[in-house]
From Swiss-Prot:
Gene Ontology cellular component list: cytosol
Pfam families, alphabetized: eIF-1a
Annotated protein name in UniProt: Translation initiation factor IF-1
Encoding gene per record: infA
Subunit structure: Component of the 30S ribosomal translation pre-initiation complex which assembles on the 30S ribosome in the order IF-2 and IF-3, IF-1 and N-formylmethionyl-tRNA(fMet); mRNA recruitment can occur at any time during PIC assembly.
Highest rank taxon of the organism: Bacteria
Entry keyword set: Cytoplasm, Initiation factor, Protein biosynthesis, RNA-binding, rRNA-binding
GO MF: ribosome binding; rRNA binding; translation initiation factor activity
Subcellular location: Cytoplasm
Length: 70
């Protein structure tokens, strides 16, 4: 059975080593996130200050995956 993932909007604060980012979420939590495969495949650039949507597993809310750049 597949668990539903949570998603929330945030702002990229800094780039960490390649495809990892520090993202400040709407609820003022600073988390580490990586880019999804489709963003990587389409070579979408994500820079500090970009507004993004981050998806989480319900099991680990400290790490996420960037699924959309606004």
């Amino acid at each position: 059975m597949k668990e539903t993932n949570l998603s929330i909007k945030g702002v990229v604060k800094e780039i960490i080593k390649g495809d990892k980012f520090k993202v400040l979420l709407e609820n003022n939590l600073l988390i580490e996130a990586h880019v999804s495969g489709k963003i990587r495949m389409h070579k979408i650039r994500i820079l500090p200050g970009d507004s993004v949507e981050v998806e989480f597993s319900p099991y680990d809310l400290t790490k996420g995956r960037i699924i959309y750049r606004h």
